[in-house]
């Protein structure tokens, strides 16, 4: 992706970008569907290019990025764990790096507010009754993003409060 200079004459519009269900690490090679980490990166790059085009054409100055969950394939189902081509730690690291790159590139074009929530695929155990709400790989992804952008003036990684009742 070739980044061009930021827009000089920005408007006061806000753009919402929703990110969800990456299931990073999962590999599918069926007659009607193919998905793997390479395809994930291609799709994220395509979304980034489309988003930047929209920012430029609409003179958008504020971008709200919503992470709606299931960024990783995770380990909650044995069948999914076996189909995953990366261990869960690599999934967390690589998704975090992809999100950092995505947000960092968008930040060249406007102010970023990032919000996220926990997905079910990031739980540590299959049975949700055996998990505490705060036992989630999504919290690691959030922490990595928070630490990466802590000193950035135009990126705000918002904290979230986890209700212990989520998933009931």
Name these PLM-found stretches:
Residues 1-168:
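Extended recognition/assembly regions associated with phosphoester-bond processing machinery
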